[in-house]
Amino acid sequence: MTGRIHSIESFGTVDGPGVRLVVFLQGCPMRCLYCHNPDTWKINGGTEMSVDEILAQYEKNHVFYEKGGITVTGGDPLVQITFVTELFEAAKSRGIHTCLDTSGILFRPESPELVLQFDRLTAVTDLVLLDIKHIDPRAHIELTGQKLDFVLAFARYLDKRSVSVW
């Protein structure tokens, strides 16, 4: 399985606990006015990489990551949910802490098929950095071009699943 990777930061200290390998994925449905990664918006940008290639990057510096792990961010990593799930499943099989940095904008509680995908992903996610862009619904649309509803639905879903959230 491959994903579209914007970049990889080998010594991340602000994207979850400890020192982390931070993987920035391509693709984001939001158009945040203050976005510091607008070059991640398009899904076809970046470089194609496999799960094994990313884990090989982790292994190069694994001694630094022992109290940290892997964080996947973007863009919004949920654009590539199947890839992230496979990466996290492989990471968890190696005892690596997993962290997902997302707004949750792509969560759709009315879609049973999508909820099953989220169930599979959250089963191997240790921590979610939930990026709520604005709490006011109108301001959220102005800021991101997207409704707040799905973000809040994702927050409720994470709570029901007892997923740790920062």
List PLM regions with ranges.
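Auxiliary Fe-S-binding modules of radical SAM enzymes
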Residues: M1-R20, L55-A56, N61, K160-S164
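Extracytoplasmic/secreted proteins and extracellular or luminal domains
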Residues: M1-R4, C28, L121
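Canonical Radical SAM [4Fe-4S] cluster-binding loop centered on the CxxxCxxC motif
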Residues: S7-M49
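Conserved alpha-helical substructure of the radical SAM core
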Residues: P38-I70
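Short acidic donor-binding/metal-coordinating loop in glycosyltransferase active sites
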Residues: G74-G75
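Conserved AdoMet/S-adenosylmethionine-binding subsite of the radical SAM
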Residues: E59-G69, L78-W166
